[in-house]
Curated annotation (Swiss-Prot):
Binding site for [4Fe-4S] cluster 2: C53, C57, C60
PROSITE patterns noted in UniProt: RADICAL_SAM (PS51918)
GO molecular function list: 4 iron, 4 sulfur cluster binding; lipoate synthase activity; metal ion binding
Gene3D superfamilies in the record: Aldolase class I (3.20.20.70)
Protein's UniProt name: Lipoyl synthase
InterPro entries reported in the protein's UniProt record: Aldolase_TIM, Elp3/MiaA/NifB-like_rSAM, Lipoyl_synth, rSAM
Signal peptide (UniProt feature, chain positions): none
């Protein structure tokens, strides 16, 4: 369910800039329901390392296939786009790049470094893939001091074989656990998409698992099927059910919880930081 298209002139301005800069956003590639709101406010989650993913998650609308090589100029194009938009809080994500030895970690690090070296007081949040469980790759990213390290578990362990093909629940938890071991000053975040057929008790158990690795921020949102070839929606959750999960999350000790049908992991990212 898409939100009404607001701020049309700003929406067009951001899209025009992205095309000119040859940059991608996960907002567009994943058909995010919040795109008009975020673009209207001149915010976006930039997607580096191309727009083709080496994984085939059953819910994701990002193009699958063999990606192109890494573009060494991309961090500088990203810098110019951020400057033009006047952003002070930037979210960077990527497709999963299992074809790269470090999963793209060094490119993430370069993007963070270029932004921080050229824009005073810039805050950078990263939404990273699992780097195939490579702890050294995670260290490379954290060395550049992003303000938030986001890695999404996406669904409950039972549904991984059908929903997150190629991923591993324990590996994803380890990314969040290792992040705190490497640098406690960096906030961690994760998200769950609901509607694949998970049970309430399974969702709560995942929330408990996230707190057990000291995850700070939690996002829960409704799954909307992008096309007939994607995983079907098994259940649509009510506003009341999302509210209940939010209350449970705060009771567990999460610093900030966004639990709404249209919530996505980067939605209101800066607000989560302000809450700390």
């Amino acid at each position: 369910m898409m939100k009404p298209v607001l701020h049309f002139s700003k929406l067009y301005e951001v899209k025009k800039l992205l095309r000119k800069s040859r940059l991608y956003t996960v907002c567009e590639e994943s058909r995010c329901p919040n795109i008009s709101e975020c673009f209207g406010n001149k915010t976006a989650t930039f997607m580096i390392l191309g727009n083709r993913c080496t994984r085939r998650c059953a819910f994701c609308n990002v193009e699958k296939g063999f990606p192109k090589g890494v573009d060494p100029e991309e961090p500088y194009r990203l810098l110019e786009a951020v400057k033009t938009l006047g952003l002070k809080y930037v979210v960077i994500t990527s497709v999963t790049r299992d074809d790269l030895p470090d999963g793209g970690a060094s490119h993430f690090a370069k993007c963070i470094r270029v932004l921080k070296e050229n824009i005073e007081d810039i805050k950078v949040e990263v939404l990273i893939p699992d780097f195939r469980g490579n702890k050294k790759a995670l260290e490379v990213v954290l060395k550049e001091k992003p303000v938030v390290l986001n890695h999404n578990v996406e669904t409950v362990p039972r549904l991984y074989p059908s929903v997150r093909i190629g991923a591993n629940y324990k590996r994803s938890l380890n990314i969040l656990k290792w992040s705190k071991e490497i640098d406690k000053s960096v906030y961690t975040k994760s998200a769950l998409i609901l509607g694949f057929g998970e049970r309430k008790e399974e969702v709560i158990k995942v929330m408990e698992d996230l707190r057990s690795v000291d995850c700070d921020f939690l996002v829960l949102g409704q799954y909307y099927q992008p096309s007939l070839k994607h995983h079907p929606v098994v259940k649509y959750y009510s506003e009341e059910e999302f509210k209940e999960f939010e209350e449970i999350g705060y009771e567990m000790g999460f610093k900030f919880v966004v639990s709404k049908p249209n919530a996505r992991s980067s939605y209101k990212a800066f607000e989560s930081l302000l809450s700390t």
